[in-house]
Swiss-Prot record:
Protein name as annotated: UDP-N-acetylglucosamine--N-acetylmuramyl-(pentapeptide) pyrophosphoryl-undecaprenol N-acetylglucosamine transferase
A matching Pfam family: Glyco_tran_28_C
Subcellular location as annotated: Cell membrane
Gene that produces this protein: murG
EC number annotated for this UniProt entry: 2.4.1.227
Species of origin: Mycobacterium sp. (strain JLS)
MF terms (GO), sorted A to Z: UDP-N-acetyl-D-glucosamine:N-acetylmuramoyl-L-alanyl-D-glutamyl-meso-2,6-diaminopimelyl-D-alanyl-D-alanine-diphosphoundecaprenol 4-beta-N-acetylglucosaminlytransferase activity; undecaprenyldiphospho-muramoylpentapeptide beta-N-acetylglucosaminyltransferase activity
Job of this protein: Cell wall formation. Catalyzes the transfer of a GlcNAc subunit on undecaprenyl-pyrophosphoryl-MurNAc-pentapeptide (lipid intermediate I) to form undecaprenyl-pyrophosphoryl-MurNAc-(pentapeptide)GlcNAc (lipid intermediate II).
Gene3D superfamilies assigned: Glycogen Phosphorylase B
Length: 373
């Protein structure tokens, strides 16, 4: 280490991998002025847009998607891995990396293998309740293994939460509420339901909540619904003087959305749970009904602290909204209890914690002084 710490972030592909990496990048820059930050990605991932937007350097390698079934891709996998590892080793040398922080996904696997070959220390962060293949490999030779939850299947881990952007972790919902409600056209004293299904929306959530629009309006509940840019939403004609149902394809200001809402209906991807709990927003989580069940596991900690409910996608219906969500939204005491439970399970300092660990590891490996505080 030549005085300037160089960090390689391996978290490309989906927003669930890129966003935590960018949150940690921001924390690193705040903690260690002059730190050199490089993100690793591929031309296929969201990082090609998200990383430059945040002002960080991006280096691209050959994509190594892990096939989910037998195909020609499986036969080509070893060749792709070797090529991606070779490219990553060259990048590690070029940027003089002192530490690699991996967040899982197909960019992380070659990063871990290359770092091991180049003797660059590794820090692994797992956001999901069930770890994927890349992090299972990386955890075997990482200096530190950090996780959002206690048992993601990586052996001994340090629970730190999932890094989220500072606009969320620093959000004061109560202080911003009046501005947020004015922004979306809600009354100051409205009860507001926030509905969103991630960056692409969720058709089942869209159909169910829009199908319950009349029941929600009859109960005096306003709705803020992000239905996804690729989807459409059909709503009944509003009753004169009824509460607004604000439907938009995408919410560019999630901080305002969280501040305006009293309750959310959403999926339970790792980033969604991390953000919703960080701001202390009660939620009804509807796990995506595919994969290995990790979304249900992601929601378990907040359910255990009383900050949320879980309902299966197959059980979500307009009748469920009328029978369960409406009474919940009109019960001030229960909402207050759930708000406290959501905040209890949330982690607002995860990005800073991961950044501290990475800087410590880099300095320890270089024989420098321990600690950056």
């Amino acid at each position: 280490m030549n005085g300037t710490i160089s960090v390689l972030l391996a978290g490309g592909g989906t927003a669930g991998h890129v966003e935590p990496a960018m949150a940690v990048a921001d924390a690193l820059a705040a903690l260690e002025p002059g730190v050199r930050i490089t993100a690793l990605g591929t031309e296929r991932g969201l990082e090609t847009r998200l990383v430059p937007e945040r002002g960080y350097a991006l280096e691209l390698i050959t994509p190594v998607p892990l096939p989910r079934k037998l195909s020609g891709d499986l036969a080509r996998l070893p060749m792709r891995v070797r090529r991606a590892v070779r490219e990553t080793r060259e990048i590690l040398d070029t940027v003089h990396a002192d530490v690699v922080i991996g967040f899982g996904g197909y960019v992380a696997l070659p990063a871990y293998l290359a770092a091991r070959r180049n003797r660059v220390p590794i820090v692994v962060h797992e956001a999901n309740a069930s770890a994927g293949l890349a992090n299972k490999v990386g955890a075997r030779f990482a200096r530190r293994v950090l996780s959002a939850v206690a048992d993601p299947g990586l052996g001994r881990v340090e629970v730190v939460g999932t890094p989220v952007r500072s606009s969320i972790t620093e959000l004061d919902r109560a202080a911003l509420r009046a501005e947020a409600r004015a922004h979306f056209g809600f009354a100051d004293d409205a009860r507001v339901l926030l509905v969103f299904g991630g960056s692409q929306g969720a058709r089942s959530l869209n159909n169910v909540v829009s199908g319950a629009a009349k029941a929600l309006a009859a109960a005096g509940i306003s709705v803020l619904h992000a239905y996804g840019a690729k989807n459409t939403l059909e709503l009944p004609d509003p009753a004169p003087g009824g509460p607004p149902y604000v439907a938009v394809p995408y919410l560019s200001r999630m901080d305002l959305a969280y501040a305006a809402a009293d309750l959310a209906i959403c999926r339970s991807g790792a980033m969604t749970v991390a953000e919703v709990t960080a701001v202390g927003l009660p939620a009804v989580y509807v796990p995506l009904p595919i994969g290995n069940g990790e979304q249900r596991l992601n929601a378990r900690p907040v359910v255990e602290t009383g900050g949320g409910l879980v309902v299966d996608d197959a059980d979500l219906s307009p009748q469920f909204v009328a029978d369960t969500v409406v009474p919940l939204l009109t019960d001030t005491g229960r909402l207050q209890t759930m708000t406290a439970g959501a905040a209890l399970s949330g982690h607002r300092d995860a990005a800073r914690h991961v950044a501290h660990v990475a800087l410590d590891v880099a300095r320890e490996a270089a024989g420098g002084r321990k600690g950056v505080r």
